[in-house]
Regions:
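Exposed, low-structure sequence patches enriched in small/polar residues
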Residues: 93, 123, 284-289, 293-297, ...
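Flexible loop and strand-edge segments within Gram-negative outer membrane beta-barrel domains
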Residues: 127-142, 152-201, 212-225
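N-terminal periplasmic/intermembrane-space "pro-region" immediately following the signal or transit peptide
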Residues: 19-83
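Short sequence motifs at beta-strands and strand-loop junctions characteristic
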Residues: 97-101, 133-137, 155, 181-187, ...
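Outer-membrane beta-barrel translocator/receptor signature
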Residues: 74-77, 84-141, 159
Length: 526
């Protein structure tokens, strides 16, 4: 089946590809946030290197809370200077008070040096109650150290190393439950080490090690996830050989077990072939194992460059994933994690395709489709009001998406995403809490040198609340505006309005989101 699909696709596109230019290059600069950092020209990463059509590949990492602060990525080339931009910022301090934010502050700083950069952040966000017992707070902080070697270094040339640590604590109440004053305190810490070298002509690799610990204070849930992952790719004259691997170890304490240990192993060996300078295919298999669960499936990926601007990607990748309680707590604060251990989530069939248009580093438009079928699709349901458990069901999921990315230019900066989703079980029931439509956009523009503006929108609709019910939450509409006015060098007066139209928003049944809120503050940059 896969061979027929690939053959048909090749017959359709090969005559067109043969007429195109074969040289595909990156420009001499990369836009990272507000400013431009010159890092020296590098070779374009071949399309077969991107072996999965992922969220990271297609969507930007967009710091909406900190537009003015430049996100500095460690240069790959040793000749790149981290501070070669005239407007380079090494720090930003924001502090503000609002109708419900009392107080809100965040600090970001960086200290670049030869062959590296040290970065840190800290934040506090205290929200007072807008309905009874809806008050909450968040405190977090972290630091990272990035190091890289020169391309001509005698030891591991062109290699990057990153050390990172982060800790946060948050507290909130189950204000839509039968016990509205019940307070959850969630503590989460993470330590990370990574190294990679993507500049090798014949061999590239990446390895990451992390340890994530999550604890619910005064609740019987503690989870530690130790995670090792990596990939390597060897380029030979006729083909490429690659392998991706991931090992996880969960140590869990909950209502039913204490210190229970579960292992998860995933691997994907592949072989890539270039059918032409612009057409690449990768074949292999996925294998996952955990306890008594095993999953095996063939894997196929194809990438095509029609031109410098236009490329097509397709992937067939059934696989299994290992998710613990911490994964679901990231999605739903009100998940009763102490009754859950983990899930070996299987996508028995899965494929995706995306078409991507790029104009240098200024404009990117991509869109496509995703499909998967699972015999144990997890979903949230409330056993009692305001408290959510997990169940699984056999389901199919169809998604169409488009992403619009207009990076900083004369017209400002604009990022937008739109997604339509249809996830249903075998009886045609919509799986709860899978929005049928999602739209987000952020637009920033500086009207003058002293006035910065940003408009953002989040829209969700078609959120069902039960598997056998047509009851849906009302559409979620959160329109926001941010203004920054320069009082004098390095100091800005800031205003932020969230939920501008004061819409009654809900993401989870019964839990009303923040109403219109105005926050005013100061921003100091250095």
């Amino acid at each position: 089946m896969i061979r027929k699909i690939l053959t048909t696709l090749l017959l359709l596109i090969c005559p067109y590809i043969a007429a195109q230019e074969s040289d595909v290059e990156l420009p001499d600069f990369v836009i990272t946030g507000k400013d431009i950092v010159n890092i020296g020209k590098t070779e374009k990463i071949p399309p077969d290197f991107i072996s999965t059509i992922s969220e990271i590949f297609l969507k930007p990492v967009f710091p909406t809370e900190n537009l003015q602060m430049k996100e500095v990525n460690t240069p790959i080339k040793g000749s790149g200077a981290l501070t070669d931009s005239l407007n380079y910022l090494t720090g930003s301090l924001n502090a503000g008070l609002g109708f419900y934010s009392l107080p809100k502050a965040d600090l970001n700083f960086s200290s670049p040096f030869t062959n590296g950069i040290f970065e840190g952040f800290a934040a506090v966000d205290n929200t007072r109650a807008y309905v009874e017992n809806s008050d909450r707070y968040l405190i977090n902080g972290g630091a990272s150290l990035s190091l890289y070697t020169d391309d001509d270094a005698s030891f591991l040339p062109g290699t990057q190393f990153k050390f990172n640590g982060e800790y946060n604590t948050s507290a909130f109440k189950f204000f839509a439950s039968d016990n509205p004053s019940f307070k959850r305190i969630l503590n989460n810490g993470n330590a990370y080490f990574g190294m990679d070298n993507l500049m090798g002509k014949y061999f590239i690799f990446s390895a990451k090690l992390s340890d994530d610990n999550l604890d619910l204070k005064n609740e019987s849930f503690t989870e530690n996830i130790f995670d090792i992952s990596g990939f390597a790719q060897l380029t030979l004259p006729a083909f490429d050989l690659g392998v991706e691997a991931n090992y996880k170890k969960q140590i869990l304490t909950n209502d039913y077990m204490s210190g229970n240990k579960i292992n998860f192993l995933s691997t994907r060996p592949t072989m890539g072939i270039s059918l032409s300078p612009l057409v690449n295919i990768t074949l292999g298999f996925n294998y996952q194992h955990s306890d008594s669960n095993n999953f095996f499936s063939p894997y196929a990926f194809m990438s095509i460059y029609f031109s410098k601007e236009l490329s097509l990607y397709g992937e067939y990748s059934p696989q299994a994933e290992f998710w613990g309680g911490g994964h679901f707590l990231q999605s739903n604060d009100y998940f009763i994690a102490e009754r859950f251990s983990n899930i070996f989530f299987k996508k028995n069939t899965a494929f995706s395709a995306a078409l991507k248009y790029e104009y240098y580093t200024y404009v990117e438009i991509n869109g496509g489709i995703k499909y998967y079928k699972s015999d144990n699709q997890p979903y949230f349901f409330d056993t009692t009001a305001g408290m959510f458990d997990l169940a699984t069901i056999e389901a199919k999921s169809y998604t169409a998406f488009v992403n619009l990315l207009f990076h900083p230019g004369p017209g400002g900066i604009f990022y937008a995403t739109a997604e339509a989703n249809n996830t249903k079980d075998n009886n045609g029931n919509t799986v709860p809490y899978f929005p049928a439509a999602k739209v987000t956009f952020n637009y920033g523009y500086n009207f003058t040198n002293n006035l910065e503006t940003e408009t953002n929108l989040t829209y969700l609709s078609g959120i069902h609340t039960a598997i056998n019910s047509e009851n849906t939450l009302r559409p979620y509409i959160n329109l926001g505006v941010k203004l920054g006015y320069q009082l004098f060098p390095d100091f800005y007066l800031t205003f932020k309005i969230s939920n501008l139209i004061n819409h009654n928003n809900y993401i989870w049944q019964g839990y009303k989101e923040l109403p219109m809120d105005l926050t005013a503050g100061l921003n100091y940059r250095w």
